[in-house]
Amino acid sequence: MPDQLVLGDWETLRDDATRIRFTVFVDEQKVPAAEELDDLDAVCRHALVFADGLAVATGRLAPDGRIGRMAVLASHRRKHYGAQIMRALLTEADAIGHAQTYLHAQCHALGFYEKFGFVAEGPIFDEAGIDHRTMLRPRGAR
């Protein structure tokens, strides 16, 4: 079965997105479970990639242009699923007309986001016990 990318709302994609996020952020990275789900989920566009029928990657785009909650199951990393999610969310952001998109990148992942035209801004900061940097991308940058 070929990979499938799905964009949708929280009501539609919640179960699969939550499973991936809790596996990656709560179980692997030890982010407190209470911090993983938030009120933004209900108003974001969400993306999932399915491989062989299993949801393996997720991310979201907030109404203000912030991309977040990018996660790929460990068993499916280095297979470009994160890139599929990012391309879909950036296409969505550009179509909506955001002048720029931004995100809080875990420091170890800065290089991944740079490939999509994001540029790091400002100092390193702590978010959920993990070092992050803000990254910005002007509309249409590649």
Regions found by a protein language model. Give the residues of each.
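Conserved active-site tyrosine of GNAT-family acetyltransferases
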Residues: 21, 113, 118
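Conserved catalytic-core motifs of GNAT/GCN5-like acyltransferases
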Residues: 104, 119-134
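Conserved GNAT acetyl-CoA-binding A-motif
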Residues: 92-106
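A short, well-structured alpha-helix characteristic of acyl/acetyltransferase catalytic modules
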Residues: 12-23
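Conserved beta-strand in the GNAT
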Residues: 48, 53-71
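Conserved N-terminal entry element of GNAT/NAT acetyltransferase domains
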Residues: 1-11, 141-142
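Active-site rim helix/loop that mediates acceptor-substrate recognition in acyltransferases
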Residues: 22-52
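Conserved acetyl-CoA pyrophosphate-binding loop and the N-cap/start of the following alpha-helix
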Residues: 76, 80-88
